[in-house]
From Swiss-Prot:
E.C. no: 3.6.1.59
Organism: Rattus norvegicus (Rat)
Annotated SUPFAM superfamilies: HIT-like, mRNA decapping enzyme DcpS N-terminal domain
Active-site residues from the entry: H276
Gene Ontology annotations for the cellular component aspect, listed alphabetically: cytoplasm; nucleus; P-body
Motif interval(s): nuclear export sequence (NES): 141-153
Keywords assigned by UniProt, alphabetized: Acetylation, Cytoplasm, Hydrolase, mRNA processing, mRNA splicing, Nucleus, Phosphoprotein
Protein name as annotated: m7GpppX diphosphatase
Gene: Dcps
Function: Decapping scavenger enzyme that catalyzes the cleavage of a residual cap structure following the degradation of mRNAs by the 3'->5' exosome-mediated mRNA decay pathway. Hydrolyzes cap analog structures like 7-methylguanosine nucleoside triphosphate (m7GpppG) with up to 10 nucleotide substrates (small capped oligoribonucleotides) and specifically releases 5'-phosphorylated RNA fragments and 7-methylguanosine monophosphate (m7GMP). Cleaves cap analog structures like tri-methyl guanosine nucleoside triphosphate (m3(2,2,7)GpppG) with very poor efficiency.
């Protein structure tokens, strides 16, 4: 999917910190809606400083670069650019082999041969996600780091995690831009406008919307002040039920994918602290869908029906990077 700089403002995340692909939290490149008109990157020049992370499996690379060095600022500005090979589109793949495709032989033995095939321009796009200007937090976020599992009690959350989160400058203005139709209004698949129990459903930027195998949408609630799973009580059950039922119905209507082919879940810890729910194709191993982070929405609803304070009391397990100050806070508090 060829996103403009305004659209790219929306990964994440996502993504999940353990994720190898960007998600709806890549929002830092501007505000606005997409266009098919030719566009330019929101900066001039790009001098690679460091490869932050790469994955041959996922065919993705994260680059830190200096930009705008010719604008009078001798030091330039920091930017992160994420390059990702896009999935094949089944309806177009035959075009790669018709006519006289440009090929370079790599290997041949009996009936087996391997080539490098150089596709035409319209079939060789690379998804490019831009984070600009990028802060030190962004550079650390995209750098590969070791992870550790930690168990957080309800008391840990109230005394350590919540104060730590409140001390951080975690802007979610991009979320409000979507909810207020200031950005990406044309990408909204479905909306329940109720200010308390409504939400918008929008494709995650990790999904190019060209095939259903990696379908990925996000439901973002209109109601403000619900940070995460830990805040949920029976008061929020109407909202959660609406997201589950209406989200599945909207996806069935738009994409002909039934609810039993969807994984519908919340992250804990989330990538950003405004309640949102992930809808992914069941066969897609989406970043952050592992047992240490994903909580199925249907089970969240049932837990709240059985115990109104379930998520205030329950011990939750999740992964943190080894350089995350929150990990050190929790580990120190849990030392015997």
């Amino acid at each position: 999917m060829a996103d403009t700089a305004p659209q790219l403002k929306r990964k994440r995340e996502q993504e999940a910190e353990e994720a190898e692909t960007p998600s709806t939290e890549e929002k830092e490149a501007g505000v606005g809606n997409g266009t098919s008109a030719p566009v330019r990157l929101p900066f001039s020049g790009f001098r690679v400083q460091k490869v932050l992370r790469e994955s041959a499996r996922d065919k993705i690379i994260f680059l830190h670069g200096k930009v705008n060095e010719d604008s009078g600022d001798t030091h330039g500005e920091d930017a992160v650019v994420i390059l990702e090979k896009t999935p094949f589109q089944v309806e177009h793949v035959a075009q790669l082999l018709t006519g006289n495709p440009e090929l370079k032989l790599q290997f041949s033995n009996d009936i087996y041969s391997t080539y490098n095939l150089f596709p035409p321009r319209h079939l060789s796009d690379i998804k490019t996600t831009v984070v600009y200007p990028a802060s030190e937090k962004h550079l650390q976020k995209y750098m590969r780091q070791d992870l550790r599992l930690i168990r957080e009690t309800g008391d840990d959350y109230r005394s350590l995690t919540l104060p730590y989160l409140e001390s951080q400058s975690l802007s979610i203005q991009w979320v409000y831009n979507i909810l207020d139709k200031k950005a990406e209004a044309d990408r909204i698949v479905f909306e329940n406008p109720d200010p308390s129990d409504g939400f918008v459903l929008i494709p995650d930027l990790k999904w190019n919307q060209q095939q259903l195998d990696d379908l990925y949408l996000i439901a973002i609630c209109h109601r403000r002040g619900i940070r995460s799973l830990r805040d949920l009580t029976p008061e929020h059950l109407p909202l959660l039920r609406n997201i589950l039922r209406e989200g599945q119905e909207a996806i069935l209507k738009r994409y002909q994918v039934t609810g039993d082919r969807l994984r519908v879940y919340l992250h804990y810890l989330p990538s950003y602290y405004h309640l949102h729910v992930h809808f992914t194709a069941l066969g897609f191993e989406a970043p952050g869908s592992g047992v240490e982070r994903a909580h199925l929405l249907a089970e969240v609803i049932e837990n709240l029906e059985c115990d109104p304070k379930h998520y205030q009391r329950r011990t939750l397990t999740f992964a943190l990077r080894t350089d995350d100050p929150l990990l050190q806070l929790l580990q120190k508090a849990q030392q015997p």
